[in-house]
């Protein structure tokens, strides 16, 4: 598990004394929060206003404070029990974005409990374990907090209290393989990650996934290599000949659309230099400008005369 420590503060006070018997689960309560702006704010703010150890968001984890040090994070007596305090951002715009961070959140909370030698239990009557801020608010001595996070935010994305407890105590069950919603398809790996803004070969077939992780289908894409690629309605990258919008195109083995002259099964074809569509029933001037080639109605190069020059200069083809 990769953790960014670029904003780790080393000047935070110790709260309480070891051993620390709890890992605290929070969410930021800020609908505009990002992992970076939360880390930046935590870096410069007065610790007496509160501090924590980790932030999860935007597909990454940032550690901003020490562990095994206590924290001012729950507003009461259990500040002195904080082995680690983890914040989840609240600015996700899609379920996929949320689930990416939720997986990291669950994994981090469980890993921190293991690291501290604590049971991976959630909000139980035992002092030791993983506790939500809500549970601390309702059960800690000398409470001065009214926070109930992270439950309301989790519920917004369909994670019930029961589901959260199950995931904390048993690990997150990841639905792998192809997934679908109203927007489209995406592909989930065994670690919960999914391809974004890249080609990926799945079961022998190449696909392309956009910046949000959705599979491209029935559309063109100009890649950073300067080549055009076509993905059919199943998402499969085109190779060889493909008929698209009543025009024929040719794609090489790497999926790149070809232009100009192409030799296929010992026969020459010409593909429009700009658009890539196969030229048929037309003349193409030679590169040196000294003559013309004729492409038959099926697009193949004529290797013998297939046209006639009439007395009035009109050229007719057979």
Swiss-Prot record:
One of this protein's Pfam families, by short name? Choline_bind_1
Which reaction equation describes what this protein catalyses? Hydrolyzes the link between N-acetylmuramoyl residues and L-amino acid residues in certain cell-wall glycopeptides
Instruction: Name all N-acetylmuramoyl-L-alanine amidase domain ranges.
Output: 19-151
- Highest taxon of the lineage: Bacteria
Q: Which SUPFAM superfamilies match?
A: Cell wall binding repeat, N-acetylmuramoyl-L-alanine amidase-like
What keywords were assigned to this record? Cell wall biogenesis/degradation, Competence, Hydrolase, Repeat, Secreted, Sporulation
Keyword presence, Nuclease: no
Is Hydrolase set as a keyword in this record?
yes
A GO MF annotation of the entry reads:
N-acetylmuramoyl-L-alanine amidase activity
Q: Which InterPro entries match?
A: Amidase/PGRP_sf (IPR036505), Amidase_domain (IPR002502), Cell_wall/Cho-bd_repeat (IPR018337)
Any Gene Ontology biological process? sporulation resulting in formation of a cellular spore
E.C. number: 3.5.1.28
Q: What does the UniProt entry state concerning the protein's domains?
A: The C-terminal domain could be responsible for the substrate recognition.
Record function comment = Autolysins are involved in some important biological processes such as cell separation, cell-wall turnover, competence for genetic transformation, formation of the flagella and sporulation. Autolysin strictly depends on the presence of choline-containing cell walls for activity.
Q: Give the protein name, as stated in the record.
A: Autolysin
